[in-house]
Amino acid sequence: MAKYQGEVQSLKLDDDSVIEGVSDQVLVAVVVSLALIATLVYALFSRNAHQNIHPENQELVRVLREQLQTEQDAPAAARQQFYTDMYCPICLHQASLPVETNCGHLFCGTCIVAYWRYGSWLGAISCPICRQTVTLLLPVFGENDQSQDVVSLHQDISDYNRRFSGQPRSIMERIMDLPTLLRHAFREMFSVGGLFWMFRIRIILCLMGAFFYLISPLDFVPEALFGILGFLDDFFVIFLLLIYISIMYREVITQRLNR
């Protein structure tokens, strides 16, 4: 009888959780999951709040700014609404025909091309803001305009991407490029005339694979044995799938240039 009462008391202690019927480990897992998802969403749909030129590039940008004659009368072209800061840090004007680098910084298309040609045009440039190597220039303006300036800018961007988009990338550089590439990949995925269907199917299969792995009881690190630590392999698998999607998107851009 005493043994039975002890077991009942032990069960009561085990059930003493913050929310009745839900273990504390599950609550911690949910909170951590939501925090990671919120961080990823913030990284995907936000950019650096401070668009300050890196000290090592200030002199080059100053000279280039004088050459570009920053007094521009032409209005800025149409832009995507999810950008909150539409000012080019090179010319200090509202970004015209904006282009985003793989590191997530926005510039006028003509400004970043001039920055490339004024500097070492034989090699990939370093971002004027964060000094990360720029291997992709992603246009954020519409392609309906077929004016001479827009066509010329598209040719310059394609020329740059054709030269440097296939450069080897370290795992850390791929992680740093992840928010920007995923944002553009998912935007094209849900737009008419964006990504071709085979690539969309591959993205859907990756997302479905991540979902089924999350709900599957078969894990590399079982939650039943390791508790909250058992969720680490789930996040790791999802993280690898996101990196794989960004690599696929980079390959799609390279294939477009070689057509």
UniProtKB/Swiss-Prot annotation:
Gene Ontology biological process terms from the UniProt entry: protein ubiquitination
Record carries keyword Thylakoid: no
ZnF bounds (RING-type): 88-131
EC number: 2.3.2.27
SMART domains cross-referenced by the UniProt entry: RING
Keyword Metal-binding applies: yes
Transmembrane segments: 26-46, 203-223, 225-245
Topological region Lumenal: 1-25, 224
Record topological domains on the Cytoplasmic side: 47-202, 246-259
InterPro entries: DUF1232 (IPR010652), RNF170 (IPR038896), Znf-RING_euk (IPR027370), Znf_RING (IPR001841), Znf_RING/FYVE/PHD (IPR013083), Znf_RING_CS (IPR017907)
Broad enzyme group: transferase
One annotated Gene Ontology cellular component of this protein: endoplasmic reticulum membrane
MF terms (GO), sorted A to Z: ubiquitin protein ligase activity; zinc ion binding
Keywords of the record: Endoplasmic reticulum, Membrane, Metal-binding, Transferase, Transmembrane, Transmembrane helix, Ubl conjugation pathway, Zinc, Zinc-finger
Pathway: Protein modification; protein ubiquitination
Catalytic reaction(s) noted: S-ubiquitinyl-[E2 ubiquitin-conjugating enzyme]-L-cysteine + [acceptor protein]-L-lysine = [E2 ubiquitin-conjugating enzyme]-L-cysteine + N(6)-ubiquitinyl-[acceptor protein]-L-lysine
Entry membrane topology: Multi-pass membrane protein
Coiled-coil regions listed: none
Location relative to the cell: Endoplasmic reticulum membrane
CDD domains membership: RING-HC_RNF170
Function: E3 ubiquitin-protein ligase. Plays an essential role in stimulus-induced inositol 1,4,5-trisphosphate receptor type 1 (ITPR1) ubiquitination and degradation via the endoplasmic reticulum-associated degradation (ERAD) pathway. Also involved in ITPR1 turnover in resting cells. Selectively inhibits the TLR3-triggered innate immune response by promoting the 'Lys-48'-linked polyubiquitination and degradation of TLR3.
Assembly behavior: Constitutively associated with the ERLIN1/ERLIN 2 complex. Interacts with activated ITPR1.
Name of the protein in question: E3 ubiquitin-protein ligase RNF170
